[in-house]
Amino acid sequence: MGLAGFARPLQWFKSQWLWLLLSIAAFWLLMRVQVEWLWFGQFDWQGMLLRRWLWQLGGLLLALLVVATCQLWQRNWIKLEGASNLAEPALPLHGWRYGLGLLGCFVVVVGDLVLLTRLAWLACFKPFALGHWWSEPFEDIWALVIPLSCVFISICVMLGNARGGRIAHLMGCFCFSISIARGWGLWSLALAIPPTGIKEPLLGADVSFGLGQFPALAFALVVLLAQLVLTTSTTIWMKLAQPESLSDWVFKGLSPRQCDVMRPLIGIILLTLSALLWLSRHELLWTQNGTVAGAGWLDAHLILPLRSLASLAILVLAFLVIPFPWIQQRRLWRLIASIIGVGAILLEVLLAPFVQWMVVKPRELKLETPYIIRAIKATRKAFQLDSITTTLINPQPQLTQLDLEQGASTLRNIRLWDSQPLLATNRQLQQLRVYYRFSNAAVDRYRFVPDKANRQQVMITARELDQAALPKRSRTWLNRHFVFTHGYGFTLSPVNTRAPDGLPDYFISDLGTSTRLEGSSELGITREDVKEAVPIGRAALYFGMLPSPYALAPSKLKELDYPVGDKNIYNHYLGSGGVPVGHPWQQLAAAMYLFEPRLLNTGSLTINSKLLIRREVRQRVSAIAPFLEVIGDPYLVSTSVNSRDHDYQAKQNQYWIVEAYTSSRTYPYAANLPDGRPVRYLRNSVKAIVDAYSGRVHLYVSEPRDPIILGWQRLFPDLFKPLEEMPSSLREHLKVPTDLFNVQVQQLLRYHVTDPRIFYSGDDVWQVPKELYGKRQVPVDPYHITAQLGSQESSEFLLLQPLTPLARPNLSAWLAARSDGDHYGKLVLLRFPSQTPIFGPEQIQALINQDPQISQQFGLWDRAGSEVVQGNLLVVPLGKALLYVEPVYLRARQGGLPTLTRVVVSDGKRIAMAEDLGEGLRALVDGSSKKAVYLNRNDLPPIKAADQSN
């Protein structure tokens, strides 16, 4: 039969396997699509998912059109007849010139493949980072780039001629298509983002161009340029690497016909490069190379004109390359345009450092002043520092009884419990089983007594299920996914009281039928007040902040609800959330989605069973709105929601509040964060509410003037609701996120200065002060207080950050973020007079530790085998004075329970230490308490901390 007889069956066999593999891939994709469709269906958001798919499909079709055009051009060019003896060849190569051309072409192909592979990698795993791909970390891509480069080298070596280049081109086309399709978020936002009406002063573009259009255009031009260059270089490679050329080390050259067909593609490449250079002028607006952020004098007067000139020269060159018949003396003009374009680029590289050193540096302040003003204004705008209300206060040097009376509402909520000691106590007393875990303690406030103007500040900790803590013998597949499915309940503690033994008081503790609700006679709160203000209801936590595997519920197996003594109480999931898996085809889809074949043979599923996935609430919000950044820890709220709101279940009381942000790296003239993170614009634009039982998600827009979120609202109008539609019982628990506040504090350290001369000299830079916590010196974190702001009669919930001058410990200012009612999100800067030194946290702690009686008591406790932990030092405005409060905890050196042992108070002039805050204040004001240690500062040696620098 011969070899030819076997060729046809072999070809048939290969095609059958190919179709089988394609069918399996299509079926697997269909199953994944079904699960995703049903998952979004639980929120009635299939329309949003469909729009996302359509955007990706549109991008894919556009990419395939470009790819098909490139493939068609390449195939037609390859078919053209090469150089002959009758025609004068172009670019003939031989000897070392041929080797150099071969090497150069190879380097271009590999470089293009590396770039396209990197973009495809980001598109698959970080699609919303494509707009700033050049600044993304590169280390995790090497695992893909190096093998691909080796594969290409092997292909070229083994296959030799055209096939190696063709496969490389197909690889690049595949990466190009993935990048375009998965970059849907860039294109859609660029089309939908509204103008802000704010023009940047250098190029006159609206700020929204930098926030939305620039990232999309930059990515589109880069990926298109890479694809076109790859098409050209692989095509040339296929000609250079012909067997006869490799054997003779000679390339005969290109025929005139081949050159004519090549010129339009070269012209398009040059047009794309020209557009990219023109767009790069906007990149000057967010550089960090000069004195301040954004374009400086050198950028505006040298680099900007040079880039414009280079772009125009390459544009002219592109038209000269394309064979238009009416253009005469083509070679001369091409040479002139090339010299101008390359010369402008070289001048930018070579001349800019010289001009900076010779012209700008000697007159830097004068030349850069207009640009410093722009940078200050833009940075303050980008981080909402321009809306800060500044108040000057001059506190009295000594606390009086009148201050205590005026600040009575503040004193009722002075926080004495830090989150770390409270968590340590909860983990030993309230976790109750090894598989429960308290992840964090969130500060919040509840209105226990309706007729009181002020709400009680509390700490709430959710008791979540930590499957990693299950004993090994209990980590079976059925236990992990059918039985141990949820956490249960929470603890609620007042921040300002303690039990007689020094442990925390609890409004709510324990769990299940053993749940204890207690009032506080000290605070005037009854058990009924707690029961009314903090309903518990159905306290199972199926969704939380800990990573959790998928769960299948309800099923034939009962789920562990909570333990009671030595017994366990079991229950079934009754929520509406989840993906139905009651029917065989749904189970097949879930098994393929999870790569879990055991689902098909478990026998434990019922017709009502549901698959619960994405149970970590931050991951859940990110899956629904991947264009939002979910930063920081969510916090739990337990409250009643009006049953008239059909989006909420009447029996459900526990909800997670998740903070979601929009950000940008391309806000004109705005500065990076001082810690180096390339964030130049940040808004806490969305508050997400997640039902802890059913997983239902609600997204509310908290920054309606943010152009980025306005763009997403245009694209997905059904996804977001205005903040006013959030139930009032949940809105009462909103607070300014600590992560956003920290970013604003970092920028304020330098950008509180608006005078360009002072800003340039750096004479008025602030810093976050430090304090001694335990045995370590740490920066003072922002802390929540319920206090009166200025001359207000009632207190409000504030997030406060004290600030000191750089390298000096005296207090310069407070930044306070308001969270209550109509004042939500407003920033207030309380500035202290510079001529009157106000003690900062370091100095007060130095006073405390130099007090002979206090230090003696600390030493006695240490020698007795206990460890003294000095807690967070709070600086609180009280009347017309300042009050410094530091809790002191005592714990055994080996895993003991932290107990609140003492409270140290000071007004900067006097110090008192007592068993509770009331005794300490009485001692501080009039020295009347016999239970307190009291000392006047005049009796102390000079403060050592005053001479320390940070």
Curated annotation (Swiss-Prot):
Stretches assigned to coiled coil: none
Source superkingdom: Bacteria
Membrane topology, from the record: Multi-pass membrane protein
Major localization class: membrane
Subcellular location field: Cell membrane
Residues that span the membrane, as ranges: 20-40, 53-73, 102-122, 141-161, 173-193, 209-229, 259-279, 308-328, 335-355
Disulfide feature: none
GO terms for cellular component: extracellular region; plasma membrane
Protein family per UniProt: Belongs to the UPF0182 family.
Name by which UniProt lists this protein: UPF0182 protein P9303_14611
Organism this protein belongs to: Prochlorococcus marinus (strain MIT 9303)
